[in-house]
């Protein structure tokens, strides 16, 4: 290649065009696009450049942005829609009265303190003071007062919890310096709420999509059904078309029986059988045969006209009107149900039933198609049939419910006032508004803090919608923001919803799911996914008609099913038919790529059903892809250069039509290639980066494509438990439980994901030099051997912070708690040991060492705090009037006081929070893990002198047993060791990104250049004997995480101790100093051994032996040698039984069951 060929005429290229025809340049130009990018010399846009799109994407979308977008949409758009739908409050008593809402908005977060000087409040202050981070909801109203119409602006009607980092939050748009001034961490993801001082996340909820036909089948049982869940603002209901005995029926909750489908269609105005037959069955003989019995059935019922059909249906309608109201005639009832309740998402104007009739016909046809062809059955678990509900949608449902209740309460109260005939002052409705403003606030706070969404209108009862944001590490908080939960019962052991679907590729993370019962039901979003919000439908409908759709009102059944016509759906409702579907779809996409319509609108062709689906609804998962045209990606190096220079953002790539968002259904309509080299002339899209099929948590693993799949899943769970740093403001926070690693390091082997999510700024782990060899017997079963000198130098050292809070209460009778002075010894005047750390203000000093059992807040409560007799003045000076209720330090090891904070809560009580600190070094039994799901406990800590060392004197920090590798097949760990070693020698951080990263050949080559063995093995010398070890040892740096499971928090044993009051058995649990239970299974083992005396000793003598008097005659329990039922002392004997058994007998007696003890002599002979 490098030879200069210009001078030599033989070697110079013949100047013939690629067409091979003479010198005609213009003719050759025709052929140029075909070869562009296909020659070897032309540079293909390299992977290096392309991934720059990722940080640009994560700036505008992704990870936590979906929560923020959803909340912003709710606050800016949905709130106004909800208020417009319920804008007027009228009175039943006075016809002239009305109250109308003109506008609604949410203000900025403010304090609720009465004496606040500065109104705005920061989230950090809410966390510390246990407040709710919320903003006022203001409305503009217009109402009548006497003879005039009054307008008022900015009337507060309640408080809305504010999501952090949303556009209503104090933090939105702030730079790092301003964040620091607010004590907030710039890397904190936001997207959660602060309710009563705890951070609450509304998890993404997964549900089946609304307003779409879903066909299910169980051919073995002879069941086929098409169902639609219609959801509108007013109601939510489910409509089925089912088969029974080969006939089709419509099933709905508001109708008592299943109604034959033909009767329904007749009631909707399709009176001719011919018309119905064409609409449902079309011209295909197989469908006609299946549909014929349904037509016959209608004739058997003697229903021929719409009126007869309506009366048939009307007789079966369930009416839920109030008892007093008179019933409509049956056919009007039926019309109302058909118009408004059945398939509620299809509107009926002026009793024009045609669209709804066609829809039911199509549903019936889909059932027939499924009966003929099993391919037509839908998959419930397919991601395209799912919708994800975000915080905004859930809050909108909640707010709508609360707002409706608020209005109905307001109306009742106004009616109550207006009923009084002799009113002295003029009636002002404004006063009523302010009275009720608590409803909305309380409802919002209750739902967020308990996680129970109970809405009366939709009969929606959901538990566990919100969770406390887990702050174990930065990754655990981030992983929680991308988590998706499905409302599926965890107990059922079905594999369908749990298995990995092919349609989840690139949308949901393939590794990150918990083990155990929630496996596969709790999922996580992949790195580049975005969840759509609702778009306006009107412009899309106009556009569709402009592209030549024929309206559904004017089309006969025959035309509908004629060859080459495709139905066009918009969000599940039928718009019309198109005879040129591919052209229609292509022109739609052209408009989307040129930025004329929203980039999140999806459109795709389904050839099975002969339909085109357009979707603009919220909750679809989509991801960006590079558009490919004529076998060439549209993104070129010059565009990436603009991006690097900061002249372009991600939005520009969308507007220029280089990148587009594709949802799951549209992916089915595309051919996506992963690398440039795979592009063929048919390719439509190119992946931006293949490693984005993993999520944020799985992206931390180096070389995950070399590991066995479940190992990556284990690491996803353990990466969230690794102790590191939580945030930059960690030392300002006072949380219930905080962990901090003393010397965190960023990993030697990084991945692209680590940089994108900022893990390298808040890492959780340390690079340990690991030797893989057997050493002593203490490394069996994954145990690790640790080097004592490494621990002395700070390896694996962490700090644990515990919060203890106490409220100094004020009581209704005028008394209040107080903080007392430390108690002194009466003789010497010294402070007693128990109060050793308490200073003169009754609180422990910061930095004091607290021993177990010492007091650190000397609180005292008045003895008469709970009686409600009002004490005259504060006459409580008597010392005896207080009893001590101090805060005592209960942990087993001494700790240090890190912080003491005094503040007031919003109800004006004084709140004291004390933060305790313990510094812990690794000890036997602490749990560590590498980033490959290889967890192990510390088995032994060895002096450095006894550890093996290499010729440079390097000693390993950890020795790991090689038996952990063969069965687990974590080759990624070995490659990490190799890459890490290279990084140390070169002074660089190597990459171990999924499907990429430093290659083993390159790494080995660099090792050899630096004078090491190419396979990463070293010659070690035994520290015990001083001889060279017989084998070469694989040694190098691996990133190890210390997990939160530490022996000090778990170790527990007891001999004697407290007992439960009721059963007199030892209590349960470590916190109550409980006993260790010998359970049923252990009992069975002892029975099998025949160790009867041991059983007696464990289950009775050491547990709860009890001497009772038993009457030998009647077999009941007596008392002090007297049997109460026989009224004698004759045959009463003493015996020992467990107290729990005695309790059981007495409880049975109380339930009128008489257990009698049949006694035998122990020694008969």
Curated annotation (Swiss-Prot):
Zn(2+) binds at residues 1111, 1114, 1123, 1126. PROSITE patterns: RNA_POL_BETA (PS01166). InterPro entries: DNA-dir_RNA_pol_su2, DNA-dir_RNAP_su2_dom, DNA-dir_RNAP_su2_hyb_sf, RNA_pol_bsu_CS, RNA_pol_bsu_protrusion, RNA_pol_Rpb2_2, RNA_pol_Rpb2_2_sf, RNA_pol_Rpb2_3. A zinc finger (C4-type) spans 1111-1126. One of its GO terms (molecular function) is ribonucleoside binding. It is found in: Nucleus. It catalyses: RNA(n) + a ribonucleoside 5'-triphosphate = RNA(n+1) + diphosphate. GO terms for cellular component: chromatin; cytosol; mitochondrion; RNA polymerase III complex. GO terms for biological process: termination of RNA polymerase III transcription. Residues 1-21 are annotated as: Disordered. Keywords: DNA-directed RNA polymerase, Metal-binding, Nucleotidyltransferase, Nucleus, Transcription, Transferase, Zinc, Zinc-finger. Its EC number is 2.7.7.6. The keyword Transcription applies. It holds the Pfam family RNA_pol_Rpb2_6. It is an enzyme of class 2 (transferase). DNA-dependent RNA polymerase catalyzes the transcription of DNA into RNA using the four ribonucleoside triphosphates as substrates. Second largest core component of RNA polymerase III which synthesizes small RNAs, such as 5S rRNA and tRNAs. Proposed to contribute to the polymerase catalytic activity and forms the polymerase active center together with the largest subunit. Pol III is composed of mobile elements and RPC2 is part of the core element with the central large cleft and probably a clamp element that moves to open and close the cleft. Belongs to the RNA polymerase beta chain family. Component of the RNA polymerase III (Pol III) complex consisting of 17 subunits. This is DNA-directed RNA polymerase III subunit RPC2. It comes from Schizosaccharomyces pombe (strain 972 / ATCC 24843) (Fission yeast).
């Amino acid at each position: 290649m490098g030879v200069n060929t210009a001078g030599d005429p033989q070697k110079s290229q013949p100047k013939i065009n690629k067409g091979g025809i003479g010198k005609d340049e213009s003719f050759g130009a025709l052929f140029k696009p075909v070869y562009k990018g296909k020659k070897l010399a032309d540079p293909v846009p390299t992977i290096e450049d392309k991934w720059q799109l990722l940080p640009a994407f994560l700036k505008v979308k992704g990870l936590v942005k979906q929560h923020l977008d959803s909340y912003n949409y709710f606050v800016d758009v949905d709130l106004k829609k909800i208020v417009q739908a319920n804008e007027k409050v009228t009175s039943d008593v006075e016809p002239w009265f009305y109250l109308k809402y003109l506008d609604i908005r949410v203000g900025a977060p403010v304090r609720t303190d009465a004496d606040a000087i500065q109104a705005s409040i920061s989230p950090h202050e809410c966390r510390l003071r246990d407040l709710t981070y919320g903003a006022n909801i203001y409305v503009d109203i217009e109402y009548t007062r006497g003879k005039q119409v009054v307008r008022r602006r900015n009337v507060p009607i309640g408080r809305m919890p504010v999501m952090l980092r949303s556009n209503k939050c104090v933090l939105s748009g702030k730079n790092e310096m301003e964040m620091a001034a607010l004590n907030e961490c710039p890397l904190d993801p936001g997207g959660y709420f602060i309710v009563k001082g705890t951070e609450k996340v509304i998890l993404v909820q997964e549900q089946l999509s609304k307003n779409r036909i879903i066909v299910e089948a169980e051919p073995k049982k002879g069941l086929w059904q098409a169902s639609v869940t219609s959801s509108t603002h007013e109601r939510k209901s489910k409509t089925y078309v089912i088969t029974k005995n080969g006939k089709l029926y419509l099933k709905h909750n508001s109708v008592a029986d299943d109604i034959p489908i033909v009767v329904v269609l007749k009631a909707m105005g399709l009176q001719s059988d011919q018309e119905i037959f064409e609409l449902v069955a079309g011209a295909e003989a197989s469908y006609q045969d299946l549909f014929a019995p349904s037509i016959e059935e209608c004739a058997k019922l003697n229903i021929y006209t719409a009126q007869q059909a309506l009366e048939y249906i009307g007789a079966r309608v369930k009416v839920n009107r109030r008892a007093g109201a008179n019933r409509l005639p049956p056919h009007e009832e039926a019309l109302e149900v058909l118009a408004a309740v059945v398939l509620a998402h299809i509107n009926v104007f002026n009793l024009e039933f045609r669209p709804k009739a066609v829809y039911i016909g199509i549903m019936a046809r889909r059932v027939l198609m499924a009966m003929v062809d099993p391919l037509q059955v839908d998959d419930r678990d397919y991601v395209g049939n799912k919708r994800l509900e975000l915080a905004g949608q859930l809050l909108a449902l909640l707010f709508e419910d609360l707002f409706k209740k608020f209005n109905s309460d307001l109306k009742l109260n106004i009616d109550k006032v207006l009923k009084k005939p002799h009113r002295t002052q003029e009636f002002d409705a404004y006063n009523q508004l302010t009275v009720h403003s608590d409803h909305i606030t309380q409802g919002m706070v209750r739902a967020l803090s308990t996680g129970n969404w109970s809405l009366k209108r939709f009969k929606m009862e959901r538990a566990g919608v919100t969770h406390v944001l887990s702050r174990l590490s930065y990754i655990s908080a981030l992983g929680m923001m991308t988590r998706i939960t499905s409302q599926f019962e965890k107990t059922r052991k079905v594999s369908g919803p749990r298995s990995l679907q092919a349609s989840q590729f690139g949308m949901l993370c393939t590794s990150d799911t918990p083990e155990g019962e929630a496996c596969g039901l709790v999922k996580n979003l992949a790195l580049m996914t975005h969840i759509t919000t609702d778009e306006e439908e009107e412009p899309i409908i106009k556009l569709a008609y402009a592209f030549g759709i024929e309206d559904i009102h004017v089309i006969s059944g025959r035309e509908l099913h004629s060859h080459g016509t495709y139905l066009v759906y918009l969000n599940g409702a039928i718009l019309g038919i198109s005879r040129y579907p591919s052209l229609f779809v292509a022109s739609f996409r052209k408009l989307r790529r040129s930025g004329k319509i929203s980039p999140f609108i999806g459109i795709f062709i389904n050839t099975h059903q002969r339909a085109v689906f357009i979707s603009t609804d919220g909750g679809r998962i989509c991801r960006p892809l590079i558009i490919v045209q004529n076998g060439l990606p549209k993104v070129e190096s010059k565009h990436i250069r603009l991006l690097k220079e900061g002249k372009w953002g991600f939005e520009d790539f969308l507007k220029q039509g280089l990148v587009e968002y594709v949802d799951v259904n549209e992916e089915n309509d595309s051919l996506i290639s992963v690398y440039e080299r795979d592009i063929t002339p048919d390719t439509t899209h190119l992946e931006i980066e293949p490693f984005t099929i993993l999520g944020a948590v799985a992206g931390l693993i180096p070389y995950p494509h070399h590991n066995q799949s479940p190992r990556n899943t284990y690491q996803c769970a353990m990466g969230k438990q690794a102790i590191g740093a939580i945030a930059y403001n960690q030392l300002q926070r006072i949380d219930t439980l905080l962990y901090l690693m003393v010397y965190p390091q960023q990993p030697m082997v990084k991945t692209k994901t680590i940089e994108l999510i900022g893990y390298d700024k808040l890492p959780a782990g340390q690079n340990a030099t690991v030797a893989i060899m057997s050493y002593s017997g203490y490394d069996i079963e994954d145990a690790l051997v640790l080097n004592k000198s490494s621990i002395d130098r700070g390896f694996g050292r962490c700090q644990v912070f515990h919060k203890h809070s106490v409220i100094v209460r004020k009581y209704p009778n005028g008394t209040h708690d107080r903080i007392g002075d430390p108690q002194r010894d009466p003789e010497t005047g010294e402070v007693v040991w128990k109060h050793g750390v308490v200073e003169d203000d009754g609180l422990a000093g910061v930095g004091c060492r607290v021993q177990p059992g010492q007091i650190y807040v000397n609180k005292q409560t008045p003895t008469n705090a709970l009686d409600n007799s009002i004490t005259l003045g504060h006459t409580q000076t008597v010392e005896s009037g207080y009893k001590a209720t101090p805060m005592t330090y209960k942990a087993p090891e001494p700790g240090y006081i890190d912080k003491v904070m005094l503040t007031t809560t919003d109800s004006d009580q004084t709140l004291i929070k004390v933060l305790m600190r313990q510094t812990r070094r690794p000890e036997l039994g602490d749990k560590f893990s590498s980033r490959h799901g290889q967890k192990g406990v510390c088995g032994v800590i060895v002096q450095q002198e006894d550890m093996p060392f290499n010729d440079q004197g390097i000693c390993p920090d950890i020795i790991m047993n090689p038996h952990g590798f063969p069965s687990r097949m974590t080759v990624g760990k070995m490659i990490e060791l190799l890459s890490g070693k290279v990084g140390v020698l070169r002074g660089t951080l190597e990459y171990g990104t999924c499907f990429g990263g430093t290659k083993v050949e390159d790494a080995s080559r660099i090792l050899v250049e630096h004078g090491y063995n190419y396979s990463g093995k070293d010659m070690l010398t035994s520290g015990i004997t001083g001889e060279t070890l017989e084998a070469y040892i694989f040694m190098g740096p691996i990133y190890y995480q210390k997990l939160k499971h530490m022996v000090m928090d778990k170790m527990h044993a007891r001999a004697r101790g407290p007992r439960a009051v009721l059963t007199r058995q030892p209590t349960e649990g470590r916190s109550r100093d409980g006993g260790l239970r010998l359970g049923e299974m252990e009992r069975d083992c002892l029975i099998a051994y025949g160790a009867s005396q041991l059983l007696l000793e464990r289950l009775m003598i050491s547990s709860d032996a009890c001497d009772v008097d038993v009457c030998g005659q009647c077999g009941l329990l007596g008392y002090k040698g007297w049997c109460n039922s026989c009224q004698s002392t004759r045959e009463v004997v003493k015996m020992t039984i467990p107290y729990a058994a005695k309790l059981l007998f007495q409880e049975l007696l109380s339930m009128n069951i008489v257990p009698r003890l049949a006694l035998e002599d122990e020694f008969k002979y």
